[in-house]
Amino acid sequence: MPKFDVSKSDLERLIGRSFSIEEWEDLVLYAKCELDDVWEENGKVYFKLDSKDTNRPDLWSAEGVARQIKWALGIEKGLPKYEVKKSNVTVYVDEKLKDIRPYGVYAIVEGLRLDEDSLSQMIQLQEKIALTFGRRRREVAIGIFDFDKIKPPIYYKAAEKTEKFAPLGYKEEMTLEEILEKHEKGREYGHLIKDKQFYPLLIDSEGNVLSMPPIINSEFTGRVTTDTKNVFIDVTGWKLEKVMLALNVMVTALAERGGKIRSVRVVYKDFEIETPDLTPKEFEVELDYIRKLSGLELNDGEIKELLEKMMYEVEISRGRAKLKYPAFRDDIMHARDILEDVLIAYGYNNIEPEEPKLAVQGRGDPFKDFEDAIRDLMVGFGLQEVMTFNLTNKEVQFKKMNIPEEEIVEIANPISQRWSALRKWILPSLMEFLSNNTHEEYPQRIFEVGLATLIDESRETKTVSEPKLAVALAGTGYTFTNAKEILDALMRHLGFEYEIEEVEHGSFIPGRAGKIIVNGRDIGIIGEVHPQVLENWNIEVPVVAFEIFLRPLYRH
């Protein structure tokens, strides 16, 4: 979880009130933080705050914490208002960056009065967002510049590796390639762009370099001090919605210091946008849902008051609350998220504890017993069980399996691209297991009983997790018949008749793959794995496999 340092006096200046250390321990809970440490330095008291929410970068600075506490205490209420005026500054984005670092969004904040506290908070927030929310600058990197040294228009371009500028902290110029090799930040983050034909570069109309995203700012414009009055902010990354959110967090934090936000026109080849966009977001929730899950007897007015403490604009009609919330938040995905804010505003310490009353006795899930029986059968057939991860990625699920990419459930903020989606089928996981064990003796006969996650628009969560069985046999001489023998034995033990209908599937050899039909329903696939798939996984022996849904075979 993100940890960050703040000055007690700076927080109190932003809120307009003073508090004791004991009071601060409770107050920071409103901002989903805990007071991790307190120390004194040069006559000032500092806090180390431990944020308990990785989806709320707006709460990772003194400005964000102070803002939330002001609302929680009723000093302010409702939706925060931020005025954004156009600056008439334009940034042109090079089309050649689409496979390098495609998106950049920008803003100007004027009229700042920076001191050591506010400057350190700005830099700390920039770094925390890039490190945590931005996945060590892979997804989001932020640059802050002295706008008075910049001559618009500005160009975000794909540059030759031989271009030169003086990076931050250096007086002499270096080529972009040299920066990756010699500069501390180049060595730390160079892997993000090193294999690209061109490198990203942000320059102004006079050719002055602002930065080399996501590596380093220039010495000329990238050094911001307490004398800086007007700043230009750039945020680059791979997903437009993520860089937009990061920009919104930065500019609204500076607006809490009295900065005036100015928007920038950003021109891409196929579209253009004005950033930042601080249009409030909207959500609706049933008030009875909040009452039921919270266990609190709250009337409509009380719920409205609690939500206003959490920076919502609330309109209640016919048992529903229509909500508007700030554009620096992107964590509202379900009514439970609204409920959480209601409980934070109410105060968890104010909820009376109740002893749970269990009216029933627990017992095992019959379907889990069925899954265990399937496992026992597979072991009895001479197979070894493996347990692989539900998390995967599109390359494993589709490209390496020689099939077209389909829509699957993806992770919004993956810690790694390797674990960026939920698997749609299990066989790719078994192929990866076989690929990692080519040094072991053959034959290798493995199976897994596990979950596959599918998109289902009819469900509340738009997804459904289905239990499946996947079997893979690897070794010299294995054919379709060997896989079918195991399937025959399984169906016989379960008391089902089945048919196999020939099917074309990129993961299997043409003419040696089929759909598995039970009671007229397609429940899976069986076949000999295609040579291209074996090559993709560096497997040098034949593999035969099948995968089936288990629920159609379950009898209560």
From Swiss-Prot:
Asked if the keyword Cytoplasm belongs to this entry, the reply reads yes
Q: Which biological processes are named by the entry's GO terms? A: phenylalanyl-tRNA aminoacylation
Q: Provide the alphabetized UniProt keywords.
A: Aminoacyl-tRNA synthetase, ATP-binding, Cytoplasm, Ligase, Magnesium, Metal-binding, Nucleotide-binding, Protein biosynthesis
Can you list the GO cellular component terms from the UniProt entry?
A: phenylalanine-tRNA ligase complex
Q: Which InterPro entries match?
A: aa-tRNA-synth_II/BPL/LPL (IPR045864), B3/B4_tRNA-bd (IPR005146), DNA-bd_dom_put_sf (IPR009061), Phe-tRNA-ligase_IIc_bsu (IPR045060), Phe-tRNA-synth_IIc_bsu_arc_euk (IPR004531), Phe-tRNA_synthase-like_B3/B4 (IPR020825), Phe_tRNA_ligase_beta2_arc (IPR022918), PheRS_beta_core (IPR041616)
Q: Where does Mg(2+) bind?
A: D331, D337, E340, D341
The enzyme's E.C. designation? 6.1.1.20
The transmembrane segments are none
**Disulphide-bridged cysteine pairs:** none
Q: Where is the B5 domain?
A: 278-353
Please report the name of this protein according to its UniProt entry: Phenylalanine--tRNA ligase beta subunit
UniProt gene name: pheT
